[in-house]
């Protein structure tokens, strides 16, 4: 599913006029891909786990895609709850992240603030998706198709 999301982002950037290849060897150029299950002390996963107030025992899987530069509000979080009992709590964590992002961007860059206001949070079974992106509906479609 994460690969399909990265492919969609690369397609969208190309359609918007970005000429360079964005997806190289499975990596999305210009984006940090954070594996929340990576316990390596050199990994940035701990920063995001603390920021979101996540407990890794709630997760079977978790990934975040964010731009390397902090001038874009794009943020895609894909979580798989360890069990169904964790889904509602994880959804609340994602809703808190949206509130935090709204507070950050409403004072910083108005165009990015609009993007955050249009954020989408979806759940399907044990999967959760958080999307702040120019075309959130495209990422939601990839999410839904991947779970069929």
Which residues does each PLM region occupy?
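Soluble, non-membrane globular domain cores that form compact, hydrophobic packing
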Residues: 1-75, 81-148
């Amino acid at each position: 599913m994460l690969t399909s999301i990265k492919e969609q982002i690369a397609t969208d950037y190309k359609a918007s006029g970005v000429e360079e290849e964005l997806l190289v060897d499975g990596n999305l150029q210009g984006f940090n891909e954070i594996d929340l299950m990576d316990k390596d002390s050199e990994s940035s996963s701990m920063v995001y786990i603390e920021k979101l107030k996540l407990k890794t025992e709630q997760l079977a899987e978790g990934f975040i895609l964010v731009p390397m530069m902090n001038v874009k509000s794009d943020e895609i979080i894909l979580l798989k709850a360890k069990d169904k009992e964790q889904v509602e709590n994880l959804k609340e964590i994602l809703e808190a992240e949206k509130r935090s992002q709204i507070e950050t961007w409403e004072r910083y860059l108005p165009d990015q603030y609009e993007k955050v206001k249009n954020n989408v949070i979806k759940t399907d079974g044990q999967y959760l998706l958080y999307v702040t992106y120019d075309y959130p509906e495209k990422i939601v479609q990839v999410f839904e198709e991947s779970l069929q």
